[in-house]
Amino acid sequence: SSDLPEASEIITDPLISMTVGDTKNLYFFHGDSASAYFSSNPNIASVTTGGVLNANDVGSAEIIYSVHGVFHQRKINVADIENPSFSTTQRENLILPDNALTTTDPVLFMQKKDSYTIQFSSSSQALATRYKGLLIWKSDKPNIVRVDSNGKVTALKKGSATITCTLGNVSCHTYVNVITDSYTGKATDFSMLTATGKQRTYRLFKQNAHNYPRYDSYLAWHGCATCSLATVLGAYNDNYSGILPSSVIDGVEKQFTSNKDWTREHVNRSLRGQMPLSLYGISSILKSSGVDNNYVRTYTDSEAKHDIISHLKTGNSIIFEVRQKNSRTGKRTKRWTNSYHTMVLLGVLTNGKVLLCDSVDRSWYNGGQRLKIVDLSDIMEYMFPCTSFSESMYYNGASSDGGYIKIYEIS
């Protein structure tokens, strides 16, 4: 304003940021008493003779005041309390601790056209709310996943993308995987971004593919456990990337079980009498092969549901067992198996369904057969806890084969 005196000193760092209705005292910003206050736009920010600033409306104004005869200039940014809008200078000047901004959604699985708003951790929520107008959201592949200024992501097509939220000098990432259930065939690869941004590839097998020399018949009858082990082992340990179920039998299974047990199941017994690896056996072999895991053998349904969903949200998989008997109704069905069956959970979708790797084709499923998208309850009704803590490496009933195995990324 032409009515303002000429300032001999311009102070712009830090800027004074206010929201409509706020009041501040200039003394606290300058550290000394002042006189002769002027505002370039009193409709935006007015100042009293005592140096009290009043934020009246959204916009910017300049305040000039005199301290010991020297005029100083301050810029005032006033934002709406419900929808803050901050300047580029403020974005650049905001300095926060390295871990100030974190999210509870490091990795997401979504289906095409689904939308979801990324959530901040409890330690970051207050900060994100306070500086909402400073948050910058970006997708590295907006043709796959779009993100708006509120952190709402929309899945557009199959693929993976990295969503970055930046606040001042810090940022956090969410890795989004847009998936379909179109995977089918004898063996197919499913790739995803993990919570660390690393690509992980699961090879999904059909157990009766008749593509496994020497073990075609065994795998067709009993191969669900071996296929599940091969899928997880190859995904979590690069030394075993792409390993076939037949190579698992002749490799890590033979290496980490006793010669007596391995020979009994693969040489001495008839095909009908041979047994698959137990969950205890799978867990043991994975640990011996450098893949960290936790075998949960007993649980209540409510505990397991919460635990399974929480683990899947980290982007890590779960190996589990189902049986013919429905634990809710007590009836026997052939929905998943006519005896016992091992499968792998790969993730939980933002719509609440789970992503399942299954080595058997299902007549009731209309999508691809290697990956299935189902309700978690559809699986949990057929899961069961261990009745004891048997250490049998091969199937020995509910004593060694109930529960589920949580897999962890190798650090």
Regions found by a protein language model. Give the residues of each.
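Active-site-adjacent structural segments surrounding the nucleophilic cysteine of cysteine proteases
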Residues: 179-273
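Mid-length scaffold segments of soluble, non-membrane domains
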Residues: 270, 274-295
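Active-site-adjacent substructure of cysteine-protease-like catalytic cores
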Residues: 301-366
